[in-house]
């Protein structure tokens, strides 16, 4: 597993073509969503694009509006091969967030309906896959396949958090998606820690200690 760097702006198929020359087709892009939040799972997605049906406007999910992400999600799932992996809070707390993320990426690649010849991974670490993998820092802004994976992972996780918010009102997960915002912090202080909070994360540990002192 090796790393790749590139200064080119905007996602394209350059890195996919490089890997195709080395390993053949198809190439999967893999990305994750939700490493930093205090609550909820980390979600990874793997995408093999159909280069004859590329959705217009693919980009890093963080640069797109929610409405645009939803529209692209529908286009990607309608034209590409997609796999999703979800590491729950129990796995995050047991293994740590990095290992849980790598496991989710492995699950996402394994869930693809077509086996990739190689994979591009967003970031600087590669999971252990059944195919060659290369890490690409800022891959979601450089590779169309990774950008597509970032959209699938982000939309999937946002939908999960919206559902969890219905069962656990008061933490504003429908807005903050489990990230450490002021309204989430207020919810922790007022309502306590839920089963969906990551107890290995320091802000959640602090809330547990504070709640114990208050009892």
Task: Provide a role label for each language-model segment.
Residues 1-215:
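RNase H-like, Mg2+-dependent phosphodiesterase core
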């Amino acid at each position: 597993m090796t790393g790749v760097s590139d200064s080119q702006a905007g996602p394209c198929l350059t890195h996919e073509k490089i890997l195709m020359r080395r390993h053949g087709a198809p190439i999967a892009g893999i990305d994750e969503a939700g490493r930093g939040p205090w609550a909820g799972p980390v979600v990874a997605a793997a995408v093999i694009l159909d280069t004859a049906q590329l959705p217009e406007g693919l980009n890093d999910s963080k640069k797109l509006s929610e409405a645009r992400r939803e529209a692209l999600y529908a286009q990607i799932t309608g034209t590409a091969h997609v796999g999703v992996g979800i590491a729950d809070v129990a796995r995050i707390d047991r293994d740590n967030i990095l290992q849980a993320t790598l496991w989710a990426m492995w699950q996402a690649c394994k869930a693809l309906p077509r086996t990739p010849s190689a994979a591009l991974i967003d970031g600087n670490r590669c999971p252990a896959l059944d195919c060659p993998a290369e890490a690409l820092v800022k891959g979601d802004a450089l590779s169309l396949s990774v950008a597509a994976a970032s959209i699938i992972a982000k939309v999937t996780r946002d939908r999960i958090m919206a559902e969890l918010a219905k069962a656990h009102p008061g933490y504003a997960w429908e807005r903050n998606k489990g990230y450490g915002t002021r309204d989430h912090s207020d919810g922790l202080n007022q309502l306590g820690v839920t089963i969906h909070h990551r107890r290995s994360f320091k802000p959640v540990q602090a809330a547990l200690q504070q709640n114990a002192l208050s009892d």
